[in-house]
């Protein structure tokens, strides 16, 4: 409801008169009452709402993904005319968007599945927008979407036509998976600095402030520096009294499930999903901590040196995560015939969204230089960073393993990097085993 309200206010602020409808009359009245003088026109029946719109109608749905979206579409259909456009701005599973696009197209309606990133504030002030559906329908809503989207530092709006049917929601799903990876990598860096150096919250804030002025400059690093020094009403550091159980809404899981369907090694992002799952086993972890032995963390030595190693490991881990995510976008584009433009996708993540970061420009540059590059790790900039930073990543992972500090995504980063650069892997033995017990056959070198 908040996302829908904020998007309506955003659209209204660009000079449009906006018809609004909610199943709850109270919520509709509340929005109007809270925003006097705004060009928000409330309607209390679907029929009146639909009939208030100019044709071709442009209807933005912001409802909970799943059955609720189908129910909302079904309630609209009796009052729609051919050529009307429904835009689904929810966190919808891309296969549902493909289905709805097909079904509505058959009835003469247009359907645009649209990823919207940036949370409640982004919805109001300018989100990153990822629309997918019929190109001609997108052209009819592009003027509105362009006006309400976030604007990058170079003045470009953070919205492009992504591709047919479910492409927009697929890109949003991978964006969310990358977000999971970024957050877990940052959490592991925090754990290493706290466990390896006993840094205070003030020192952590200072460290992250410095990091945010360099290669790691991003929204997530920026908010993390603030989180470290935020205190509760009792004067305690808030982060230290928050229970260590990370929730999830399932979009990271969808990204991992899709990687399995496509045969893509999305190991880092998948580990970040699993890290949230194991965090939720709090009671089991507390019990296991009293039974299972392991090393106690020893101090990591020179402070400045270790902080720099963790910074480098974090940046290279981030690069590996994005390399995996964009590799999956390529596989999906081939599978679903979307013809995705990876450099432009990286561009629209530069403002408005949760993963906005300075380094996204490097991804755009890499694809501008070589549109067909198989993996971002092979692009000159990222290859040079990997050459320079991999020792730090190895040292940090080795320290963590020796000292019993779990670093699932840092570990996944180095494992993927080494696997990807290996001309020969021990999979020949696995294939021999498969042939031995199941006559699966094999290829000779």
From Swiss-Prot:
It catalyses: 6-phospho-D-gluconate + NADP(+) = D-ribulose 5-phosphate + CO2 + NADPH. Its EC number is 1.1.1.44. Keywords: Gluconate utilization, NADP, Oxidoreductase, Pentose shunt. The keyword Zinc does not apply. InterPro entries: 6-PGluconate_DH-like_C_sf, 6PGD_dom2, 6PGDH_C, 6PGDH_Gnd/GntZ, 6PGDH_NADP-bd, 6PGdom_BS, NAD(P)-bd_dom_sf, Pgluconate_DH. It is an enzyme of class 1 (oxidoreductase). NADP(+) binds at residues 1-4, 22-24, 63-65, 91. The active site is at 172 (proton acceptor), 179 (proton donor). One of its GO terms (biological process) is organic acid catabolic process. The keyword Transferase does not apply. Pathway: Carbohydrate degradation; pentose phosphate pathway; D-ribulose 5-phosphate from D-glucose 6-phosphate (oxidative stage): step 3/3. Substrate binds at residues 91, 117-119, 175-176, 180, 249, 276, 434, 440. GO terms for molecular function: NADP binding; phosphogluconate dehydrogenase (decarboxylating) activity. Belongs to the 6-phosphogluconate dehydrogenase family. Catalyzes the oxidative decarboxylation of 6-phosphogluconate to ribulose 5-phosphate and CO(2), with concomitant reduction of NADP to NADPH. Homodimer. This is 6-phosphogluconate dehydrogenase, decarboxylating. It comes from Citrobacter freundii. The lineage of its organism: Bacteria, Pseudomonadati, Pseudomonadota, Gammaproteobacteria, Enterobacterales.
């Amino acid at each position: 409801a908040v996302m829908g309200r904020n998007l309506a206010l955003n659209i209204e602020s660009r000079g449009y008169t906006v018809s609004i409808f909610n199943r709850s009359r109270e919520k509709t009245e509340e929005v109007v009452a809270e925003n006097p003088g705004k060009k928000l026109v409330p309607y209390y029946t679907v029929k009146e709402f639909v009939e208030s719109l100019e044709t071709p109608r442009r209807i933005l749905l912001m409802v909970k993904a799943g059955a609720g979206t189908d129910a909302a579409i079904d309630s609209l259909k009796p009052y729609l005319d051919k050529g009307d456009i429904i835009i689904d701005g929810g966190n919808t599973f891309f296969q549902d968007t493909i289905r709805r696009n097909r079904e509505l197209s058959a009835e003469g309606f247009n359907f645009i599945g649209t990823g919207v990133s940036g949370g409640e504030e982004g919805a109001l002030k300018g989100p990153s927008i990822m629309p997918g559906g019929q190109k001609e329908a997108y052209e009819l809503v592009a003027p509105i979407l362009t006006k309400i989207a976030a604007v990058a530092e170079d003045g470009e709006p953070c919205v492009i036509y992504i591709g047919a049917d479910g492409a927009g929601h697929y890109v949003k799903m991978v964006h969310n998976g990358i977000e999971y990876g970024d957050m877990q990598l940052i959490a592991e860096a925090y754990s290493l600095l706290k466990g390896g150096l006993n840094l205070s919250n003030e020192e952590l804030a200072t460290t992250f402030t410095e990091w945010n002025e360099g290669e790691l400059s991003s929204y997530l690093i920026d908010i993390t520096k603030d989180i470290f020094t935020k205190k509760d009403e009792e004067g305690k550091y808030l982060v230290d009294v928050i229970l260590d159980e990370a929730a999830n809404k399932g979009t990271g899981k969808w990204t991992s499930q899709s990687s399995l369907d496509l045969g893509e090694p999305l190991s880092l992002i998948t580990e970040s999903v699993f890290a949230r799952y194991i965090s939720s086993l709090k009671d089991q972890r507390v019990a296991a901590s009293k039974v299972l032995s392991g090393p106690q963390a020893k101090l990591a030595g020179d402070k400045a040196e270790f902080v720099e190693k963790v910074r480098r490991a974090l940046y290279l881990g981030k690069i590996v995560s994005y390399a995996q995510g964009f590799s999956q976008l390529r596989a999906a584009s081939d599978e679903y015939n979307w013809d995705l433009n990876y450099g432009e996708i990286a561009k629209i993540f530069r403002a408005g969204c949760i993963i906005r970061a300075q380094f996204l420009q490097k991804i755009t540059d890499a694809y501008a230089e070589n549109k067909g590059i198989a993996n971002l790790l092979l692009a000159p900039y990222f290859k040079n960073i990997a050459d320079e930073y991999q020792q730090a990543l190895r040292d940090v992972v080795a320290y963590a393993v020796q000292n019993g500090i779990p670093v699932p995504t840092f570990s996944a980063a180095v494992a993927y990097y080494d696997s990807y650069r290996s001309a020969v892997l021990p999979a020949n033995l696995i294939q021999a085993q498969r042939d031995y017990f199941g006559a699966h056959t094999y290829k000779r070198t």
